[in-house]
Curated annotation (Swiss-Prot):
Top-level taxon of origin: Bacteria
Keywords: Cytoplasm, Queuosine biosynthesis, S-adenosyl-L-methionine, Transferase
Subcellular location: Cytoplasm
Catalytically driven reaction(s): 7-aminomethyl-7-carbaguanosine(34) in tRNA + S-adenosyl-L-methionine = epoxyqueuosine(34) in tRNA + adenine + L-methionine + 2 H(+)
Name this protein carries in UniProt: S-adenosylmethionine:tRNA ribosyltransferase-isomerase
Originating organism: Syntrophomonas wolfei subsp. wolfei (strain DSM 2245B / Goettingen)
Record pathway: tRNA modification; tRNA-queuosine biosynthesis
BP-aspect Gene Ontology terms: queuosine biosynthetic process; tRNA wobble guanine modification
Amino acid sequence: MQHDKNEDIYRLSTYYYDLPPELIAQYPAEYRDSSRLLVLDRKSGDLNDRAFKDISLYLKKGDALVLNETRVIPARFFAYKESGARVEILLLKKLGDDWEALVKPARRLKAGSRVFLSPDKPLVIEIVEELDFAGGRRVRFQDSVDEDTLLQEQGHIPLPPYINRPDEELDRERYQTVYACKSGSVAAPTAGLHFTPDLLKEITLQGINIVRIVLHVGMGTFRPVKNEDIRQHNMHLEYYEVAEDAAALLNLTRESGGQIVAVGTTVVRTLESVYNKDCGFLAGKGETNKYIFPGYQFRAIDKLLTNFHLPGSSLLMLVAGFAGTESTLAAYRHAVENRYRFFSYGDAMLVI
């Protein structure tokens, strides 16, 4: 069931589905591993409703569970123009001494503008230039600022727009995985949010290898697919790192007959980017704009753990590429009917 033959798989409209708004999780589950887990067998299309803690039943000794250890930076700032008008700045990535940022309302923030981080303090962010994407700006903090301290003290966790509330203190913990350690993302790799230290320890004691890689989630996560022919979509570049020991463990897993289980679409895109059919997994760091949709030949992964994704998103298309479009959409209908919780703070799906 993996490869659907008809042309509908390339139509954007195929990837829209009906989602009652009350199923969009606004807060995380009380306990990380108390989420639900929908298991989809991509060969048969069979579905199984489980608890997330049951994931270890689908892993075996010698498998590799691959985690993205990126950390979300508190990169959202609410600032003020000299007129007192409120604006929003989301830092995306460092550009030398400056930052690439997404600003709104963009029409009010032209090159040369200055904004203040509070109405009564003279802490300045300068808009240096306009960039080549909607709302994109190069911005610069005034010289004397310790940026790390500023991020921690005044930055907000950049919750996705479908979470209809301000960020709270709990988000500083719960919108990070328990293994997040390398700062650089503007959105969490959400499939990993369900793991606890105890569950990871239990999985390790089963003889499963835990492999850690990095992909910093960036602009691409906010970029909707707009082309009706999804093959025309382009992804933004995102930074990744695969260390020598991680590549070696992945290659050893394959050579030993183990399966590679990707925790999240970010891991899939990274592993598919560094896999070479002649040499296996290659260590390295760089940027990838790997775009995966139905018809793609997967080479690097055997199973995929992921959350439920937005209608019409490139992430949903990646899942459909792995599981088959019809099976994926049927799983989503099942999830809606059975009141699963959707998106970043929602439940998980395991494709086997």
